[in-house]
Each structure stands twice: as structure tokens, then as C-alpha cells.
């Protein structure tokens, strides 16, 4: 899944709050086991433990023990409060993307560079939830005259995906409803 690869590129720019939302979104999208959440979000187990604890403390997820063929397994589920949080945060991110798109469409290169710089930490979350139109996003870099890898220069991990042509097919897959709802 290309948006996951994109998150790896931008992972170091993600704020703690963005990681919380991405974990919540992954659980909401059916990734309910610890190891799978860690893989899907590219968040190390130690850090993921803390995030899950925080989400549980805030009442956004519930931890359930299920009996399976191989013994007990822990399953995580999003609560109604957690679902409301996802909807609200996705709405905010859609607003940020809309602003970014409007600046791009205005043709103001300097303003676009400034807004991109200011919103850098939100970009992975926008990508994870399918808010970013990848074609337009790449055209923004063209307008600024820089490559994505230059914009995120210095990111030691995941840069091999920076110019992945496959990313452009992630598109805006019918996300008028916010994607994961």
C-alpha cells in the first residue's frame, strides 16, 4: 500500500499527536492486533505500547481478550468516542489540504513553499487517511522546482521511496467521506 510507504518517508516529521491518530485510524480500519498495527503504521513496538496506553486512557480504544485456537489473543477496537475523534481530526486535515490546494492553485510559489514547510508534520497523516491527491501533491513540488526527496532531505530512513512512481496511483480513492469511516 503506497500511502504506508509515504508515511515511512515522512515518519520523522510526524508529531506524537499525528501518530496517535494514525494508530487510531489503523485500528478503525480493521488492523486490531499489536504486531499488525506496528507493521501497518511503521511505529516501533516500544513507542506503539505508549500510544495504545494513551488511546485507552483517553477512552478512544478498548482492549479485549479473545480466546482463539492458539490460546488468548488481544484485540483492539475503537470506541464511539475514538470514532468521533477520527472524524473531527480528518475534517481538520481536509481543511489543511484544501488550504494547501488553494495556495497551489493561486500560483504563488513563495507562499506554497511557506505553507508546505508549516504543514510538513501533517503531511504523513493526510497521506495515511487518503486526503492528499498525490498527483496534485507532486505537481506542487514541480511548481516549487524541487523534488520530494529535496523537500524531505536529511531523512535517513525511507528515502528510497521518495521518488517512487508507484505512489501516484494512491490518488484520492473516493474519500469524500473522509476515507476510513
Predicted feature descriptions by range:
Residues 1-126, 142-181:
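N-terminal leader-region detector that preferentially activates on the first domain or presequence
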Residues 131-140, 144:
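Membrane-proximal interfacial segments on either side of biological membranes
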